[in-house]
Design a protein with these regions (language model features):
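Residues at beta-strand starts and edge strands
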Residues: 58-60, 105, 292, 350
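N-terminal ordered "arm"
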Residues: 33-36, 43, 56-92
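Non-transmembrane, aqueous-exposed alpha-helical and coiled segments at domain scale
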Residues: 316, 322-354, 360-409, 466
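N-terminal basic/disordered segments at the start of proteins
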Residues: 1-64
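Active-site-facing alpha/beta catalytic cores
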Residues: 70, 77-330, 373, 381, ...
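Short loop/turn segments at strand-loop or loop-helix junctions that form parts
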Residues: 64-69, 111-114, 356-359, 402-404
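Short beta-strand elements
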Residues: 66, 312, 343-345
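A general structural signal for short secondary-structure junctions and capping/turn motifs
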Residues: 52-56, 99-101, 286-287, 388-392
Length: 468
């Protein structure tokens, strides 16, 4: 029998990827302050997301999850307004969701890596530059990106700043998705100016025309579109990696409608990273006791027996929608490793959402020294992921992307054929390279073709047997 869970039982377990704070008393005071703050999300919203993901796990939906690699307290470009960046991200995200919904004829569950993605695991605890060694940048919630001793010192006050930024971002997102901006009648207005000249823009315009015609037909038939909230707004959920557990513990509250149930109110969904998914460690211990839907990042080092053990710990009731397996294997390894993983999970009857993260396994260093991700490798992993699920008879249920609504140049390739030469003026990420708006929409149309082909295959009647 596992030990009775409380919000702080994780503190008795081994832990990785958490910084050493010089002032423990200051950290404890900040965590106490956070515990008195209002929740960012509500348990009922997390339950709604879990229900929607449960339908995805059963093959009745698709998960679109994406956003910044790491959010920043200050925008990387001084002339960018934060509100505009949030709006532009949402515009691209809504475009992608419309493309996928239309192609798959399935509801698309929309989950952003936003309003809380401020902490990042690192492969090395220190970073060297010009002969000087300092602690690695671990995200704005922990320390600063500037390469100096003061900035790189973990600062507890940053936890409060992260809460405030998350609250402001979430408030703006709620206003956009429920205040009319996400109205399907605005489908044409979501296109960003610099995307209008892109090779995929005419495909999106054609799709927008078909949607507008369908809405016009429905109105002509007497349907009052204003009385259907599902056409005027959408459900949009937030997520981030559950990495800085002191922050997550402070944001965990008992569900007032279901005593004894605990919800981490920093986001609707949390995930456990590839570097922190050890079954007997702190991050798994914390996550097993909260009711939020959870993701598990599965990289090349993931072993099937360990994965099954994680599923037993984190989802002992085998609840649909509780677990999303976010596979980040790389274009070269996904075809070899994913089939065995799928078979192991299916053999045990585990209900999960299978999601493809084609970003993290395809990171390289360019000739000019920039960290980048070739777009063709990203596409290759996505194609192989869905091909494996088609071959195994399982549902490839989603994608998990690092992306932005900005006109950056961080991933090479795509319709505009971005190269190293473009990085000099348009490389703005504080951590890992992201798909820009055009590349994100390019990927959505590729996914649309894969989902449409899958839908056609499922709908095609089997040939009648001879003699029947």
């Amino acid at each position: 029998m596992p030990e009775r869970w409380t919000r702080d039982t994780w503190r008795k377990k081994p832990i990785l990827q958490v910084p050493e704070y010089p002032d423990k008393a200051a950290l404890a005071a900040v965590e106490g302050q956070l515990a008195s703050f209002p929740p960012l999300v509500f348990a009922g919203e997390a339950r709604n997301l879990k229900k929607a993901l449960g339908r995805v796990a059963l093959g009745e939906g698709f998960l679109l999850q994406g956003g910044d690699c790491a959010e920043s307290f200050s925008e990387p470009s001084a002339n960018n307004v934060s509100a505009n960046n949030i709006r532009d991200f949402l515009r691209v995200f809504l475009q992608m969701a419309v493309v996928l919904t239309y192609a798959a004829a399935l509801p698309v569950v929309k989950v952003g890596r936003i309003a809380g993605q401020f902490a990042k695991p690192r492969s090395s605890p220190t970073e060297k530059k010009d002969g000087k060694e300092l602690p690695s940048y671990r995200g704005d919630i922990i320390n600063g990106v500037e390469f100096d001793e003061a900035a790189r010192r973990p600062d507890p006050a940053r936890l409060v700043e992260a809460f405030r930024h998350s609250a402001a971002t979430l408030n703006l997102l709620r206003a956009f998705v429920h205040g009319g901006y996400a109205n399907l009648a605005n489908v044409r207005q979501w296109t960003l100016g610099f995307v209008k000249d892109s090779p995929q823009s005419h495909h999106y315009e054609e799709l927008a025309d078909r949607i507008s015609e369908a809405l016009g037909f429905m109105q002509a038939c007497g349907l009052d579109l204003e009385s259907h909230p599902e056409l005027k707004s959408t459900d949009f959920y937030t997520s981030h990696e559950a990495l800085l557990l002191g922050y997550e513990q402070a944001m965990t509250r008992e569900d007032s409608t279901r005593p004894g149930t605990w919800c981490c109110t920093s986001a609707h969904m949390l995930w456990i990273g590839d570097r922190t998914r050890q079954p007997d460690h702190a991050h798994v211990e914390f996550c097993r006791g909260i009711m939020n839907p959870l993701g598990i990042k599965c990289g090349p080092s993931s072993k099937n027996d360990e994965l099954l053990r994680l599923l037993d710990i984190l989802n002992p009731e085998n609840e649909p929608g509780r677990i999303t397996l976010i596979c980040r294997l790389g274009a070269d390894k996904v075809g070899d490793q994913l089939p065995g993983m799928v078979r192991a999970v299916e053999r045990e009857g585990k209900l999960v959402v299978w999601s493809c993260d084609p970003m993290h396994g395809n990171t390289i260093t360019s000739d000019t020294g920039y960290k980048t991700r070739p777009f063709d490798r990203i596409l290759s992993e996505v194609k192989t992921f869905f091909a494996v699920h088609r071959a195994e008879g399982t549902h490839g249920g989603g994608v998990h992307l690092e992306m932005t609504g900005q006109n950056v140049a961080e991933c090479t390739g795509g319709a505009r054929m971005i190269t190293d030469a473009d990085f000099k003026d348009r490389y703005h990420t504080v951590c890992d390279p992201r798909l820009n708006a055009e590349q994100s929409i390019d990927l959505a149309f590729l996914l649309a073709e894969l989902l449409k082909a899958e839908r056609t295959t499922k709908a095609r009647p089997l040939p009648a047997a001879a003699g029947l």
